[in-house]
Swiss-Prot record:
HAMAP family: Nuclease_YqgF. It comes from Bifidobacterium longum (strain NCC 2705). Its EC number is 3.1.-.-. One of its GO terms (cellular component) is cytosol. SUPFAM superfamilies: Ribonuclease H-like. The lineage of its organism: Bacteria, Bacillati, Actinomycetota, Actinomycetes, Bifidobacteriales. It is an enzyme of class 3 (hydrolase). Pfam families: RuvX. Its main location: cytoplasm. One of its GO terms (molecular function) is nuclease activity. It is found in: Cytoplasm. The keyword Nuclease applies. This is Putative pre-16S rRNA nuclease.
Amino acid sequence: MVWLGVDLGNARVGLALSDPELTFAHPAGNIHVAGDYFFAIDEVLNVIEDEHVDHVIVGLPLQMDGTEGKSAKKARRWAANLEKRLQAESEDSDSTEYQIPQVSLIDERLTTVSAHRQLFEAHKASNKHRPVVDQQSAVVILQTALDRTREQ
């Protein structure tokens, strides 16, 4: 069993994968999208297939008061479009063994702050954060989901 964490950004989509035991999240790269979220869905579908992903966790960027702003609505639409594409892929698949991965949203408030802090603590120079902060944010999102699952 493998889970995929997704942090949607305007320029990059950060990815993280879990270990098969669903204990640890690790960075899995960025998708450079420049606002083209359909391209991001195509790339995520490739990762899902290549890594045999069972569950996709998408960060939901709520505002500090818990309400949904423009970015959260965009994340919800993106997750819904991913689910539609997964359903279509399932219907087009000849395999009866194809399992559609579950797609969930998780509150990602302050994950970027946490990601920057983790990179700083790892002695990564702050001018080198930009290329990796999205995937580190995806790690924080996914690790939060994994920890919550273990606590239940």
